Amino acid sequence: MKIFDVVVIGGGPAGCAMALDLNRRGYDVALCDQAKFPRDKVCGEFISPGADPILEWLGVLASIEALAPKRLKGVAISSYESAELEIDYPVSTETGLRPSSLSVPRYQLDALFLKQVQNAGVKVFEQHKVTDFIFDDDCVAGVHGWDENKTSFSLQAKLVVDAGGRNAVSLRKFNLKQEGNGKIAFSAHWQGVRLPDDYCYMHVSRPGYTGISSVGNGRANVVLVVDRSALDGKKAETLYHNVLMSNCRRCEMLQGAERVEPVRSVESLAFAVKPVPCGGLVLVGDAMGFIDPFTGEGIYLSLRSSQIAGEVIHAGFQNSNFSRKFLSVYNARRQEEFGDKFLLSRVLQWLIYNRPFCNGVMKRLSTNRV
């Protein structure tokens, strides 16, 4: 059986970025995903400006731009039906220019990413679901799973990277997930949404919040995040529409608009992950933990975590060392860089569900801009 240098589980932004990174460093990489691409995902489809340099380094930014994605100037926040406060991205200290963020449908982004991975020479196994690991002593040394024909397969590797998201096989195998705040997100694309300007519009009001942003071609992505308890036996589409239209600011934007696809949902938002208990295995992207989507940082954090992991994995190959202790450097670096963002996410959760404080902060921000 062929032994790859690295097997990557998951073909989302984190997994594709990881595969491209290691391929560019000269390693023999395989990537497995249980889906057939293109496929869709529940996502804000909003990529913060910090991702642009990473996408360019990976060689995919020009291809994304060719899709004619929407470029957003920042966010516009409404607190409990108040007028939106528009917040532009700050001017870059390096370029002196004000950056913008990409807004592009996930089914387009992920399909483009995977095509780039295939073109780079990575061996891609679509419709291959990884269900377990191969072990050599206390280190992961490959994967087992099933293909689309329910035929078992095995791939051996010197290292495995799990980019399988919030339901990653590593989280289940080693019981690593520490459940968070019980949030659930609903999303769908709409046609004809009336957005005043090129911002991601965030509306905070009970029982949750929404993010609305154009994704180009006359369509907008409308995401609702609420506590799981808000469902209370209701159908997802009923809850989604009722909550959207219960806010006068959203209602104005959605008046005359049409939902053009079924409402999708995803649970287990905002969770933490315990350390990996063995060597030969690295987790990247949402598999390493998921912060609340209100921050709009999810895809950037996935890309950046893969970039950090690539540096540590490269050092592991140079030292022929994939022990748990050696690879823990990645966890430390990730925490050092992202720790403040995770803290901010927790603070935001308290803020947006505390109406007087949320209104007070928005009023203070508005006053400071005058």
What do the PLM-derived regions correspond to, one by one?
Residues 23-43:
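Glycine-rich FAD pyrophosphate-binding loop
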Residues 1-12:
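Beta1/beta-strand and adjacent pyrophosphate-binding region of the FAD-binding site
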Residues 93-115, 231-235:
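Short beta-strand to alpha-helix junction loop
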Residues 15-16:
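N-terminal Rossmann-fold NAD(P) dinucleotide-binding loop
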Residues 314-370:
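C-terminal helical "tail/cap" subdomain of flavin- and related membrane-associated enzymes
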Residues 116-254:
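Predominantly flavin-linked oxidoreductase catalytic cores and closely associated redox partners
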Residues 67, 232-313, 318:
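FAD/FMN-dependent oxidoreductases across multiple families
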Residues 42-81:
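N-terminal FAD cofactor-binding segment of flavoenzymes
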